[in-house]
Amino acid sequence: MLKATGPLSIILLASTCPSSGAAPLSFAEFNNFARECAPSVAPSTLAAIAQVESRFDPLAVHDNTTGETLHWQNQAQATQVVMDRLEARHSLDVGLMQINSRNFSVLGLTPDGALQPCTSLSVAANLLGSRYAGGNTADDEQLSLRRAISAYNTGDFTHGFANGYVRKVETAAQQLVPPLTARPKDDREKPGSEETWDVWGAYKRRSPEGGAGGSSGPPPPPDEDNRKSEDDDQLLFDLNQGGPQ
């Protein structure tokens, strides 16, 4: 659930990004929307949040007043139902990144806009960016990112740790795996290790028992051999990014 406590300067890109028309979004669709509409935040970071919030469904709506979670295949129908429930003074979390309806006026959003994947991602990226303070070390940067994620859910830098939201996003980031695609025969025959889609990059840890480690606090520093991707310098912050190399 997106929480906003003050005006945000956002660029609504819905007019340039088509509606998905069906839910949920595929990895490729989500990645394209994220890179086009929220270029300041790594797609993997946004994907982990979207998995927790809507499971990549741009037409998902959670009615906090009734406790219902609603899904549509048709955006026009979804928009009408959202408008009807807002008229009845319901509190709703709307769209791909689950923007709360009480923030619509602050953000300059309409029900239709909140259901647009591009707009939802743009708003989410701007909120995260407004709460991300950075840091002097890689550990500081990662803790700052988690604090921004906490604020995204609760409007507070610490409550999202206490209620388990930050941990849920961490878990989603570790579990998200893109679909396997076929490689050319020549490529399959080449020796060497395979690359994986590791949203935690250099920060992937193991517990003493051998399971996946991880807490809501800052992870250990990265190995010096880890290399940044070409996109790293273009991202405001990234769960993939292990800090300066």
From Swiss-Prot:
State the CDD domains in the record.
LT_VirB1-like
Which Gene Ontology cellular component terms are annotated? Answer: type IV secretion system complex
Q: Which residues form a coiled coil?
A: none
Q: Which NCBIfam families match?
A: PRK13864.1
Q: Which family does it belong to?
A: Belongs to the virb1 family.
Could you tell me what this protein does? VirB proteins are suggested to act at the bacterial surface and there play an important role in directing T-DNA transfer to plant cells.
What protein name is recorded for this chain? Protein virB1
Q: Which organism is it from?
A: Agrobacterium fabrum (strain C58 / ATCC 33970)
Q: What gene is this protein translated from?
A: virB1
